[in-house]
């Protein structure tokens, strides 16, 4: 029972809509009505500006990061293969990612999982996250598309999990990559049409 409570708590924390709350609280804006209509960090930068964008990014990363440690902090006990699986920090973090993408507070219309996924990886393997961040910024520098850099980094996480033979990370990163591609499908279409906005600060 406590495992279910932990996973639900992880989902609810992940579902906290940082961009929406910051936009409403400090700018009196519903971020969903501007830019891409997304509640995540990238649209927060675009609509609310850099300070708010950095705050939303931090909060979204923190959501994923903190949930990874729930199995250590909460009174959950694994007494079999199924309970062991669901008390793995990566699996608990996955529920936070799902909450971010499909938040119950906003009728299941949330962000694209990039920052929250980064927080989960930070919690379980900081060195891997550093490598992925380097890849992300290299792709971003070359092509100027946040969406493309995010997808490439996610796919590299799948490859990295194979290299280090972390098969739970492989499952989670594969699922997250699929979610990322689905959530970025409109961005992908705009890239092919030459209509996707490029960043201007790199």
Swiss-Prot record:
An annotated GO cellular component: plasma membrane
Keyword Transmembrane helix carried by entry: yes
Pfam name, any one: G3P_acyltransf
Keywords, sorted A to Z: Cell membrane, Lipid biosynthesis, Lipid metabolism, Membrane, Phospholipid biosynthesis, Phospholipid metabolism, Transferase, Transmembrane, Transmembrane helix
Keyword Cell membrane in annotation: yes
Signal peptide: none
Domain of life, source organism: Bacteria
InterPro entries for this protein: G3P_acylTferase_PlsY
GO process annotations (BP): phospholipid biosynthetic process
One Gene Ontology molecular-function label: acyl-phosphate glycerol-3-phosphate acyltransferase activity
Function noted in UniProt: Catalyzes the transfer of an acyl group from acyl-phosphate (acyl-PO(4)) to glycerol-3-phosphate (G3P) to form lysophosphatidic acid (LPA). This enzyme utilizes acyl-phosphate as fatty acyl donor, but not acyl-CoA or acyl-ACP.
Family the UniProt entry places it in: Belongs to the PlsY family.
Name of this protein: Glycerol-3-phosphate acyltransferase
Organism: Staphylococcus aureus (strain bovine RF122 / ET3-1)
Chain's gene name: plsY
